[in-house]
């Protein structure tokens, strides 16, 4: 059994999905060393990530970059000599995680305690104490499980889950009744994972027809609001895009009937809250939704059209493998899942 950890860090990209995986890794450390000081380092969007993890009092979120030297000094003060530091795997095949992050992780970790993942960087062999192979046929969460095993830390949590600060005022604010609405989240962080605006509208209309007695609640960011209004035009959907905080969204998801989403952070929040989820993904997002990610019994229906990209992903403004998904079938599944 690994010795108790006094302090540990993980470096992550500043997205909801990546930070959820970082929290899962740290949560397993916390289960084995509850007194440990644990930090998740991001380059930006720390306010959003703190909101995401407001229910985790033991988790420190640190935003560190070259524009925030004070944060770098704070990391040195609080986490120098860490018993374990884990950096993130590369976001795409042939890529590599930030070299500057790797260098700073090396400075913070005790000798023998820096774990990373194989990627395209030629510097890895000089920096890391242990490198974990990344397999494209494995679920994303399996990378973090492999890092825990490499560190000798027992995996206490078989699958990622999420806690939130319960507050039913979100239901009252948006005039919703628990169990009588569906969250519809059709906006990814970039168009390369999303649906064309016309397809968004087709899906909202199909959902409205298939679920006439269920309120549709269209979520998204502030920049998505105008498109959300266009997608829902002529329906009775409630538009909350740009109005709900992450904690409010978690409360709404927890009290919803179902979530319909493209492959983005909100879908993973729903999956980790164990809510019935209908998710549409691209061919390159497959590893995020393999059964090892959330378990064979997770209430998740996955829609994809990988066959369209059989010869390789067709990168377009809006991906062909998303455009080919049958939105009528998605709407039908939202009724029955």
Residue map of PLM features:
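Catalytic machinery of carbohydrate-active enzymes
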Residues: 1-337
């Amino acid at each position: 059994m690994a010795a108790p950890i006094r302090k540990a860090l993980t470096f992550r990209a500043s997205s909801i999905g990546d930070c959820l995986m970082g929290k899962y890794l740290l949560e397993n450390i916390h289960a084995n060393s509850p007194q440990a000081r644990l930090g998740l380092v991001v380059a930006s969007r720390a306010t959003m990530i703190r909101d995401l993890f407001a229910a985790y009092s033991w988790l420190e979120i640190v935003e560190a970059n070259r524009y925030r030297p004070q944060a770098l000094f704070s990391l040195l003060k609080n986490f120098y000599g860490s018993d374990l530091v884990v950096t993130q795997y590369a976001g795409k095949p042939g890529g590599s995680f930030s070299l500057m992050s790797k260098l700073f992780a090396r400075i913070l970790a005790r000798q023998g305690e820096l774990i990373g993942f194989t990627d395209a960087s030629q510097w890895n062999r000089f920096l890391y104490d242990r490198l974990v192979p990344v397999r494209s046929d494995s679920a994303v969460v399996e990378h973090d499980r492999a890092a825990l095993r490499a560190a000798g830390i027992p995996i206490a949590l078989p699958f990622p889950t999420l806690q939130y600060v319960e507050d039913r005022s979100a239901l009252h604010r948006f005039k919703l009744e628990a169990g009588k609405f569906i969250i519809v989240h059709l906006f990814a962080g970039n168009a390369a994972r999303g649906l064309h605006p016309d397809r968004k509208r087709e899906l909202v209309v199909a959902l409205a027809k298939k679920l006439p007695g269920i309120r549709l609640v269209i979520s998204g960011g502030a920049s998505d609001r105008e498109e959300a209004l266009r997608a829902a035009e002529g329906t009775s959907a409630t538009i909350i895009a740009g109005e709900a905080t992450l904690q409010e969204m978690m409360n709404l998801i927890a009290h919803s009937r179902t979530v319909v989403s493209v492959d983005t952070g909100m879908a993973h929040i729903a999956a980790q809250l164990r809510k019935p989820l209908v998710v549409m993904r691209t061919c390159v997002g497959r590893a995020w939704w393999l059964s090892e990610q959330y378990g064979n019994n997770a209430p998740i229906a996955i829609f994809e059209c990988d066959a369209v990209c059989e010869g390789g992903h067709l990168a377009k403004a809006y991906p062909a493998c998303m455009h080919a998904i049958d939105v009528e079938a998605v709407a039908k599944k939202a009724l029955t899942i």
